Amino acid sequence: MSIKDITIVITSFKSDEIIRNCLNSIDNQCEIILVENSNNIDFKTNLEKDFKNVKCFLTGENFGYGKANNIGLNKVKTKYALILNPDASLYPSTLNDFISSIEKVPDFAIIAPFNQDQKNQNNKFEERNLPPMPVNNVKGFAMFLNISQFKDVGFFDESFFIYFEEMDLCKRLINLNKKIYLAPKVKINHSGGQSHNKSINEEMELSRNWHWMWSTFNYHKKHKGFLVSLLIVFPKLSSALIKVIIYSIIFNKNKRKIYYQRLSGLVNAISGKNSWYRPKV
């Protein structure tokens, strides 16, 4: 096996300020499938011109994390794929370390890097050269997928626009006795929370708060039922309502917006509406 057997799948949305750092970190022998959640033809043209191993697909609208990744994954022709966020980057040894990890657990469905963020890079576990360790779920910013393991489970549930889609996928894999691992040897640099241009931070923050609450309720509803999910989110619902009232009284417009988004996301989820909210950018 070589790194040519791995396809990188990246989903982006207005990420032109940061995407090049990610792409520059990837060996040019790897095919990169980039799914851009817009109709930005200049973004596609410039990247495909500068990176010969990149194929950029424009969705025409913002499909979110799960559906856009599914578009990319369904175009993969290699045995393995690496889902990578645009605010993440590879170290020179990342792909070869992944290959050596595969040899220890060839039956894996997902392998994720042990250092889930930069704070963990000096973790003692990384120094021990441990084999991949079985887990029940991993974070979605970087996941190596064994494509053949997904024939009977599918990829992401597209009803989730953002958040909890990787937890849902891991849950479905575990339910079918598929194997998920953390690999201490595999390192990926992840800046976190900045997968888009800084100019749209405020609107993206509103969108994140809405979808975090919507996805929280619907993930638990899907796997535990409506009533259990309602019990789980009720404290969040009450807190959001109280804070909307408080911040309205003291004229804190920014805080009121945030908690209104949380309240709206939960109310829409509880009432059975889909994840319709999109950032206004």
Identify the residue ranges that each predicted region occupies.
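Short, well-formed alpha-helical segments that are part of the catalytic scaffolds
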Residues: 12-28
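Short aromatic/hydrophobic "clamp" motif used to bind/position activated sugar donors
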Residues: 81
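Glycine-rich, basic loop-to-helix element that forms the pyrophosphate-binding segment
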Residues: 59-76
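A conserved acidic beta->alpha catalytic loop
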Residues: 25, 36-45
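Short beta-strand/loop segment that forms part of the nucleotide-sugar
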Residues: 30-39, 57-59
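A short, conserved alpha-helix in the catalytic core of glycosyltransferases
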Residues: 142-145, 149-154, 159-189
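Conserved donor NDP-sugar-binding/catalytic core segment of glycosyltransferases
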Residues: 91-123
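Non-catalytic, C-terminal membrane-associated alpha-helical segments of glycosyltransferases
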Residues: 207, 211-215, 226-281
